[in-house]
Amino acid sequence: MAEECLARKFNLSDNYCPAYFDGLLCWDPTPWNTLAVQKCFKELYGIQYDDTQNASRLCLDGVWHNYTNYTNCTERIANGSPTDVASLIYLAGYSLSLAVLSLAVFVFLYFKDLRCLRNTIHTNLMSTYILSACSWILNLVLQNWSDESQQDQTSCMILVICMNYFYLTNFFWMLVEGLYLYMLVVETFTAENIKLKVYTTIGWGAPAVFITIWVISRCFVNVLPSTGPDGLAMFPEAKMCIWMHEHQVDWIHKAPALVGLALNLFFLIRIMWVLITKLRSANTLETEQYRKATKALLVLIPLLGITNLLVLCGPSDDSWFAYAFDYTRALMLSTQGFTVALFYCFMNTEVRHAIRYHVERWKTGRTIGGGRRRGASYSKDWSPRSRTESIRLTV
């Protein structure tokens, strides 16, 4: 584009500033002592700008002034816009999920009865939801309550890196959940061969590798120019956090997340096939078989992250359907952690029994004043883990 701009040579006298490209817009030859004005750009790095406003550059005695005035080229976000409404939905959903997930993680960590490989995987997945929600809320706060012109690039870089890492760990722990269930239900003879260390390496280690590669690549790309060809500031928003602007190298961490979702979709199909086959072989009514299969499907969808596939692509126009899709996506994605905590902790029979047992033991201790404890059906550290029960409690 710069070459095309500079090639604009008309039959002009010497009393003109030559064609000039400042890195964003092309300025045609302009008479001396004239303020050149043209429309702002519509979009820059995925961000929509108000193109009804103007940018300007001054031509003085045959030489362009060393600064282009882009002050009026502001981001197009109207008050009460669908983007604002969707952000509020995200904020409410993430806040709710954060509170419920924190309580669920506390339950799994506090009660030793619940400690097993399956619940440890659940705890790690819920932890990634918590970290992702915290980073999203922090990012929202910084974007709306901080002065963008004074944003510290180092702090912003750390926040964006952490946010992308937590998001990616979330997808990889979903993959771990899918792999664990697949090995448990489909590959029943090899399920015990995969230890917690392997799952931990997949869930926390693999995302670290992709994020490291992404950070190194991102450091070498020019995302948002802060100076023009003359070396002087040309765009006020160049002081914004450049790490928040999308770039093609972002696919380094986006692609693994999509691959993980695709694998989980495969795991879900195989698991449902095995479950439906077992239900058909059992002596149960057909309606009962459909009910159990539907229940298993609805419970597994949020655990394996299939919700993300349902709202992966949508309309981008200004129709009512596009607005409804944005709101639905915001609601489903922000409350996904809440759904996982609800299904796999608070509605889990094993968890409810463990909580009830400890509450009763606490009441008994207070009643007898620290005397002899009532006999219990199982101790605090005891937890039955047969394969059949594990499948039942998981699905």
UniProtKB/Swiss-Prot annotation:
Gene3D superfamilies: GPCR, family 2, extracellular hormone receptor domain, Rhodopsin 7-helix transmembrane proteins. Residues 1-87, 141-155, 218-248, 315-329 are extracellular. The chain crosses the membrane at residues 88-111, 120-140, 156-176, 196-217, 249-272, 296-314, 330-349. Its main location: membrane. It is found in: Cell membrane. Keywords: Cell membrane, G-protein coupled receptor, Glycoprotein, Membrane, Receptor, Transducer, Transmembrane, Transmembrane helix. GO terms for biological process: adenylate cyclase-modulating G protein-coupled receptor signaling pathway; cell surface receptor signaling pathway. Expressed in Malpighian tubules. One of its GO terms (cellular component) is plasma membrane. It is a multi-pass membrane protein. InterPro entries: GPCR_2, GPCR_2-like_7TM, GPCR_2_diuretic_rcpt, GPCR_2_extracell_dom_sf, GPCR_2_extracellular_dom, GPCR_2_secretin-like, GPCR_2_secretin-like_CS. Residues 369-395 are annotated as: Disordered. GO terms for molecular function: diuretic hormone receptor activity; G protein-coupled peptide receptor activity; peptide hormone binding. Residues 112-119, 177-195, 273-295, 350-395 are cytoplasmic. The keyword Disulfide bond does not apply. Residues 382-395 have a biased composition (Basic and acidic residues). Glycans are attached at N11, N54, N66, N69, N72, N144. Receptor for the insect diurectic hormone. The activity of this receptor is mediated by G proteins which activate adenylyl cyclase. Belongs to the G-protein coupled receptor 2 family. PANTHER family: DIURETIC HORMONE 44 RECEPTOR 1-RELATED, PDF RECEPTOR-LIKE PROTEIN-RELATED. This is Diuretic hormone receptor. It comes from Manduca sexta (Tobacco hawkmoth).
